[in-house]
């Protein structure tokens, strides 16, 4: 089974990236709590699973932060965004390819999946 989760299972207050098997959960909202509940249910029920935590997803279709910022930049002389968030964007095409590759293995467990190694700050 593949369960798509989120970085929202953590509180975002760490100084270093969380390891995939980290159990220091601290969801800050209902979305994070519900995804954590799903993760725990999968891990307690199944032996063979991929729990894949993703963040800042963007792609060609649908709404996302990058498209929104491009639209704002076209229509406004100045763009303002929060500057207290750090994350690593995840491109949908790359995520889909990785998920297909993962399912062809038996390397079950928890995974943090984003593009690149360095976090992206919104300022």
Which role does the model predict for each range below?
Residues 9-52, 57:
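Catalytic helix-loop patch of NAD(P)-dependent Rossmann-fold dehydrogenases
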Residues 98, 105-123:
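Mid/C-terminal beta-alpha module of Rossmann-like enzyme folds, strongest
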Residues 18, 56, 65, 108-111, ...:
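Tryptophan-centric aromatic hotspots in well-structured domains and transmembrane helices
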Residues 5-7, 84:
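Histidine-centered beta-alpha loop that forms part of the nucleotide-sugar donor binding/catalytic region
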Residues 40-87, 93-94, 100-101:
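NAD(P)-dependent short-chain dehydrogenase/reductase
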Residues 29, 87-90, 120:
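Residue-level signal for the nucleotide or nucleotide-sugar donor/cofactor binding architecture
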Residues 2-4, 52:
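Hydrophobic structural elements of the Rossmann-like NAD(P)H-binding subdomain
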């Amino acid at each position: 089974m593949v369960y798509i989760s989120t970085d929202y299972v953590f509180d975002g207050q760490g100084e270093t990236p969380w390891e995939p098997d980290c159990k220091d959960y601290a969801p800050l909202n209902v979305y994070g709590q519900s995804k954590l509940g799903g993760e725990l249910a999968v891990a307690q029920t199944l032996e063979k699973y991929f729990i894949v935590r993703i963040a800042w997803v963007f792609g060609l279709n649908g709404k996302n932060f990058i498209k929104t910022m491009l639209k704002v930049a076209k229509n406004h002389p100045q763009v303002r965004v929060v500057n207290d968030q750090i994350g690593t964007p995840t491109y949908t095409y790359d995520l889909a390819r990785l998920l297909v590759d993962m399912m062809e293995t038996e390397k079950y467990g928890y995974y943090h999946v984003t593009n690149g190694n360095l976090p992206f700050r919104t300022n």
